[in-house]
Amino acid sequence: MAGKTLYGKLWDIHEVARRDDGSSLIYIDRHILHEVTSPQAFEGLRLAGRPLWRVNANIATPDHNVPTTKAERQGSLLSIADTVSRLQVQTLDENCDDFGIFEFKMNDVRQGIVHVIGPEQGATLPGMTVVCGDSHTSTHGAFGALAHGIGTSEVEHVLATQCLVTQKMKNMQVRVEGTLSWGVTAKDIVLALIGKIGTAGGNGYAVEFSGSTIRALSMEGRMTICNMAIEAGARVGMVAVDEKTIQYVHGRPFAPKGSDWDAAVAFWRGLVSDPDAHFDRVVELSAEEIKPQVTWGTSPEMVSAVDQSVPDPERETDPVKKESLIRALKYMGLQPNDPITSIKLDRVFIGSCTNSRIEDLRAAAEVVKGRKVASTVKQAMVVPGSGLVKAQAEVEGLDKIFIEAGFEWREPGCSMCLAMNPDKLGSGEHCASTSNRNFEGRQGIGGRTHLVSPAMAAAAAVAGHFVDVREMMR
């Protein structure tokens, strides 16, 4: 009998029942909530008179709509200028209070982006099923967890039953071998992968990232890669448990203690794919061949190495793809064969659930230390992923490095990743962003988003256009 993949093991542990239509009912260990996708779910519970099935399986925090300036964060929620944003944050507070859910409220130092604080607090643990009303819940798979986003109706279902109806996925292995050169990061790995297999390449798959390169990554780097598995079309991204996983979790507030910890670790060590496990698809990447990546279009698959040029649609033989390239270039205001390094930036954003952890801020600070943001850049901002990340960065003096260079040092939140709060691009503005999506209007109506790593974003802020961070730091 063939061995099992990590995904297969976690599925089998959590499958409650199989249904006649081929779907299954799976048990959910951890449910994370935020202010945008939860209000209707709570209202549904009230209307039906249903209690929560397991209150302590849920944690919550506001992140999408919270402002990131000190002026709007001081005092009560009344300081939030936008009425819709204020209402959503207030509603989350009220719902959590009414149903007894533990919430990191807006001005709690532990507040932050859901996919940053879950692991940070130890609320995400190896072997868990983790869901949240947000597609980038795949981030938590970095801990050997089965994690994915759900819709609002499913949020209500999990609150009421602690179970979810879903279809079992196929298995994909992405194997990355070799040593990354300095200045090439986890963000570049996942962008290179998406460039290779496309945004539909992972459709229907749970993706396990493996190989020597992945094992060498920090937990922060693994979270970055799993975060963007969704941009490759997969619903799930995961990495097998190893000593780095266990060390990261140890001592965190929600992590097991004492004998419970010992028992948990013994179980976690088995959360790896068996040597003879079968994968339905295997994709291989060589770390040495990966260079710093920059997206130039309106999809994460529209990506090139920094030393390359914008593609020419006339060289595309597929008429559908050709039309897509033409539309993207028009929206982005670029010409075929423009060098990536010729793209000038109006704004730079370092943050989001992809790249706002302490390792990301350290990498960016290393680049900007002793340098200044280019005068042509209208705004450069750093938004830590949580209050604890912000506090740690300030202990290390990173805030001073950024401020002296001309960056704005903000309060935690989703910020400019998406146009749901005051941090937005103006029409036609180009932004070097460490976020995960570059769709039309993602950061503001008419805004032009270029996805990069924190180091590349920092280098672009200093130069005023894209540059190879490896050259800048020589």
Curated annotation (Swiss-Prot):
Per UniProt, [4Fe-4S] cluster binds at C353, C414, C417
Q: Which GO terms describe its molecular function?
A: 3-isopropylmalate dehydratase activity; 4 iron, 4 sulfur cluster binding; metal ion binding
Q: Which terms are listed as keywords in the entry? A: 4Fe-4S, Amino-acid biosynthesis, Branched-chain amino acid biosynthesis, Iron, Iron-sulfur, Leucine biosynthesis, Lyase, Metal-binding
Subunit arrangement?
Heterodimer of LeuC and LeuD.
Q: Which family does it belong to?
A: Belongs to the aconitase/IPM isomerase family. LeuC type 1 subfamily.
* SUPFAM superfamilies, alphabetized: Aconitase iron-sulfur domain
Q: What is its EC number?
A: 4.2.1.33
Put simply, this protein is called: 3-isopropylmalate dehydratase large subunit
Please give the catalytic activity noted in the UniProt record: (2R,3S)-3-isopropylmalate = (2S)-2-isopropylmalate
UniProt pathway: Amino-acid biosynthesis; L-leucine biosynthesis; L-leucine from 3-methyl-2-oxobutanoate: step 2/4
InterPro entries for this protein: 3-IsopropMal_deHydase_lsu, Acnase/IPM_dHydase_lsu_aba_1/3, Acoase/IPM_deHydtase_lsu_aba, Aconitase_4Fe-4S_BS, Aconitase_4Fe-4S_dom, IPM_dehydratase_rel_enz, IPMI_cat
- Name its co-factor(s): [4Fe-4S] cluster
User: Does the keyword section mention Iron-sulfur?
Assistant: yes
Keyword Iron carried by entry? yes
Q: Main role?
A: Catalyzes the isomerization between 2-isopropylmalate and 3-isopropylmalate, via the formation of 2-isopropylmaleate.
Q: Pfam families per the record?
A: Aconitase (PF00330)
Q: Which GO terms describe its biological process?
A: L-leucine biosynthetic process
User: What superkingdom heads the lineage?
Assistant: Bacteria
The record ties this protein, via HAMAP family, to:
LeuC_type1 (MF_01026)
Gene encoding it? leuC
**What is the UniProt remark on how the cofactor binds and its stoichiometry?**
Binds 1 [4Fe-4S] cluster per subunit.
